[in-house]
């Protein structure tokens, strides 16, 4: 019996990888345009990192992490999200000593044990960005605009930006008390998870996908009505900067996010094209996370997007990489010339294919069609003798003659 992939872990096959490369390359362009640098961190971390950052009572830590004990009796976890590992590296390598302001981005796989569904898997991939060292709301607006710019870059203007503020440690306790008072008489209508959340993290009841909980929490107090003056001013400034740049957004007072480290600005990009699980990107400010992980008191803000979900939004677009040229030969005597041309053209950045097995000309041209090559050329004895050949544009059959020299062919293909 053949071995298959683990449930919820998918292979990205060649016909799909072009779509992923398109997404990743667009993200790199946007990030680097905004002054961000790439950081790469391990996919495994000490379990304590996620317990301290995400929160012991979060669904991720309690139910979804892939955690194991290694041969050295250390508790190790496959990363369920990217921010904690990036901040661990920021602290460990004392990046803050050089400059507290860091603008970092990352790409890579994450792991959560949850029920696989459309666009959501046990191994999934995220692209994320983090900014440290600045509390100014202008940075929040830049991060939000950068995220929206990415979706515009890949031709997706449908996802809409939703924002909220979760306040700070000064104003959140009063809101927590008000929310608990509201929920007290509705506990019997909450799901079992939310009954447990009521005492440990009541804000998470607002994020529950259960229809019963959504109904029970209708009319719940809003965090926006309980912000301290500093947080209210901060959120007003974020909105003002977004308005200044003409950014489209709406306020979602029920947005709380699933990670415990968020403070003040939180946000999601949502779409109606993926069913109930509508967020394709999300993030927020985490001003206490770095100190919580043992570093200095330095603020931060960031986001992550799910690559699988973004790929779904791109629909049926064709991202395959077509060869620029297919070189066919009439016989073994012309293969040396074809191979030399192939090598020289590839070294000049041209995508070229040829037959490797001495197949018939008919078979070679069928392969050129299958690969959807832009041009084809047939090298026979006459072409070899004259040093010239006709290059056929495959979409309409138009032929142009050129010398069998790399520079001439590059000019013709341009």
UniProtKB/Swiss-Prot annotation:
Which Pfam families does the record associate with it? HGTP_anticodon, tRNA-synt_His
The record's similarity note reads:
Belongs to the class-II aminoacyl-tRNA synthetase family.
Q: Where in the cell is it found?
A: Cytoplasm
Q: What is this protein called?
A: Histidine--tRNA ligase
CDD domains under this entry? HisRS-like_core, HisRS_anticodon
Q: Name one GO molecular function term.
A: histidine-tRNA ligase activity
Single GO cellular component term? cytoplasm
Q: Give me any GO biological process, just one.
A: histidyl-tRNA aminoacylation
How it assembles, according to the record, is: Homodimer.
The catalysed reaction is: tRNA(His) + L-histidine + ATP = L-histidyl-tRNA(His) + AMP + diphosphate + H(+)
- Which organism does this sequence originate in? Pelobacter propionicus (strain DSM 2379 / NBRC 103807 / OttBd1)
Superkingdom field:
Bacteria
EC identifiers of the protein: 6.1.1.21
Record-linked NCBIfam families:
hisS (TIGR00442)
Question: What UniProt keywords apply to this chain's record, in alphabetical order?
Answer: Aminoacyl-tRNA synthetase, ATP-binding, Cytoplasm, Ligase, Nucleotide-binding, Protein biosynthesis
């Amino acid at each position: 019996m053949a071995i298959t992939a683990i449930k919820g872990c998918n292979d990205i096959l060649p016909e799909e990888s072009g779509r992923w490369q398109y997404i990743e390359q667009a993200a790199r362009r946007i990030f680097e345009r905004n002054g961000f640098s790439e950081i790469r961190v391990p996919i495994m971390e000490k379990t304590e990192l996620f317990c301290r950052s995400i929160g012991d009572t979060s669904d991720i830590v309690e139910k979804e992490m892939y955690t194991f004990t290694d041969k050295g009796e250390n508790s190790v976890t496959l990363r369920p999200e990217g921010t904690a590992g990036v901040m661990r590296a920021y602290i460990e390598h004392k990046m803050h000593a050089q400059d507290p302001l860091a603008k970092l981005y990352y790409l890579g796989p994450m792991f959560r044990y949850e029920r696989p569904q459309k666009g959501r898997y046990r191994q999934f991939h995220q692209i994320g960005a983090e900014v440290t060292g600045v509390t100014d709301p202008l940075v929040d607006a830049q991060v939000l605009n950068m995220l929206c710019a990415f979706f515009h870059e890949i031709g997706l203007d449908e996802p809409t930006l939703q924002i909220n503020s979760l306040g700070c440690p000064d104003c959140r306790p009063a809101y927590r008390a008000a929310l608990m008072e509201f929920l007290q008489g509705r506990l019997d209508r909450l799901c079992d998870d939310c009954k447990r959340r009521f005492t440990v993290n009541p804000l998470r009841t607002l994020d529950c996908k259960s229809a019963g909980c959504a109904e029970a929490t209708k009319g719940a107090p809003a965090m926006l009505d309980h912000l301290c003056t500093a947080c209210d001013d901060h959120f007003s400034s974020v909105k003002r900067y977004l308005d200044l740049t003409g950014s489209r957004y709406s306020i979602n007072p029920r947005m709380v996010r699933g990670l415990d480290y968020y403070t003040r600005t939180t946000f999601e990009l949502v779409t109606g094209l993926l069913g109930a699980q509508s967020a394709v990107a999300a993030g927020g400010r985490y001003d206490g996370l770095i100190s919580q992980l043992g570093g200095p008191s330095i603020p931060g803000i960031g986001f992550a997007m799910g690559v699988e979900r973004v790929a779904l939004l791109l629909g049926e677009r064709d991202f395959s990489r077509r060869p620029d040229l297919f070189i066919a030969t009439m016989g073994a005597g012309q293969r040396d010339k074809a191979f030399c041309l192939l090598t020289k053209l590839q070294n000049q950045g041209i995508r070229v294919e040829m037959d490797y097995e001495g197949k018939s000309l008919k078979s070679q041209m069928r392969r050129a069609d299958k690969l959807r090559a832009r041009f084809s050329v047939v090298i026979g004895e006459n072409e070899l003798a004259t040093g010239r050949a006709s290059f056929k544009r495959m979409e309409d059959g138009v032929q142009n003659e050129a010398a069998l020299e790399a520079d001439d062919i590059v000019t013709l293909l341009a």
